[in-house]
């Protein structure tokens, strides 16, 4: 049996080992190097952080199953893990921390990064992710940010393999005289009408690609169009990041000084009332019909009563809050680039009336 964690001295031993063998601290040169990172490089670090975090959490869950009742927070806990296993966990956490420090340095070097980190619930990793994925040069209004983040699924749903195949079959019937090796703009226009995608995006991203170079060839076939339509019409990584932002706003919802935490609470209460009044009964019935939900689950009990489960209501509240936040992020990026206010102030039809919702922090102080 390996040596077990007994006292503070043993914990110090683990920390010393990490100092010697792990990435206990990164040098000043490494920290400074992040200032000039490209956006793809920032995305790499953000992805690396979350991949490392996911691996560490899976590893810790597996370690907990080795001994029952393990609690690493209790000094002198009985039946604790051997030092070797504790060292591994702390080394993983340490590596996460080093990436976080680098992203903190990176976001400190950018006014928009400093603005984002001034918002409660947004730390250096989330801020860096937003900077890496959102490009004001490619957006004319906030809804484009929201769509790119996959938060407008009702307007532009992910068709998937089956949905795209069905749509292509319908289009072939509608346009029987089309050249199958070079589709016309008429097909693209119909795609835009049905999916709410932009004409430029459909025509560009549906083109056949060169196998070796992956370069676009300038024409679209039925097969290349179907492949394009089968892909998510949003950035999956950004959507995941926005989910994490929503979770973070939920965690700070107890702070009165947190605007987005407060909006989350209000929206959750609003959604709960609508749910209790069975205003989502049609959605509940549709989900129950479409998905194979275990009859013994709380979700099934809710759907069968014409209601959405609590987790679903919570997710709706988080998405609504993140949408408001993304509007504010767009406004801030627009002001930073053009030094004027966005053309149309964001007015939200919210809680049954229209309110102007101002950002938690005045972004003009940072630019």
Annotate the PLM regions:
Residues 116-121, 133-134:
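Short, Lys/Arg-enriched phosphate-binding patches
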């Amino acid at each position: 049996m390996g040596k077990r964690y007994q006292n503070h001295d043993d914990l110090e031993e683990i920390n010393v080992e990490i100092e010697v063998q792990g990435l206990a601290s990164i040098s000043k040169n490494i920290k400074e190097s992040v200032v000039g990172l490209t956006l793809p490089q920032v995305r790499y670090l953000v992805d690396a952080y979350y991949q490392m975090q996911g691996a560490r959490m899976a590893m810790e869950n597996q370690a907990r199953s080795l001994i029952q009742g393990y609690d690493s927070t209790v000094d002198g806990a009985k039946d604790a893990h051997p030092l070797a296993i504790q060292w591994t966990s702390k080394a993983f956490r340490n590596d996460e921390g080093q990436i976080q420090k680098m992203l903190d340095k990176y976001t400190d070097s950018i006014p928009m990064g400093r603005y984002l980190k001034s918002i409660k619930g947004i730390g250096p990793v989330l801020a860096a992710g937003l900077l890496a994925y959102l490009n004001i040069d490619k957006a004319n209004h906030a809804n484009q940010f929201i769509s790119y983040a996959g938060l407008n699924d009702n307007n532009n749903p992910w068709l998937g393999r089956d949905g795209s195949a069905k749509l292509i079959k319908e289009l072939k019937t509608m346009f029987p005289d089309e050249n199958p090796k070079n589709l016309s703009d008429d097909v693209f226009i119909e795609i835009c009408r049905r999916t709410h995608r932009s004409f430029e995006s459909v025509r560009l991203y549906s083109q056949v690609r060169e196998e070796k170079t992956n370069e676009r060839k300038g024409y679209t076939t039925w097969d290349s169009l179907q492949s394009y339509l089968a892909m998510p019409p949003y950035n999956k990584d950004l959507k995941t990041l926005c989910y994490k932002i929503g979770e973070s706003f939920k965690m700070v919802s107890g702070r009165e000084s947190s605007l987005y935490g407060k909006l989350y609470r209000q929206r959750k209460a609003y959604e709960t009332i609508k749910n209790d009044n069975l205003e989502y009964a049609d959605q509940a019935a549709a989900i129950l019909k479409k998905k194979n939900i275990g009859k013994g689950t709380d979700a099934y009990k809710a759907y069968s009563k014409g209601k959405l489960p609590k987790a679903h209501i919570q997710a709706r509240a988080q998405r609504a809050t993140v949408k408001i936040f993304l509007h504010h992020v767009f406004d801030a990026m627009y002001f930073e680039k053009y030094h004027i206010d966005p053309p149309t102030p964001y007015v939200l039809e919210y809680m049954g009336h229209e309110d102007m919702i101002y950002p938690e922090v005045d972004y003009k102080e940072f630019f």
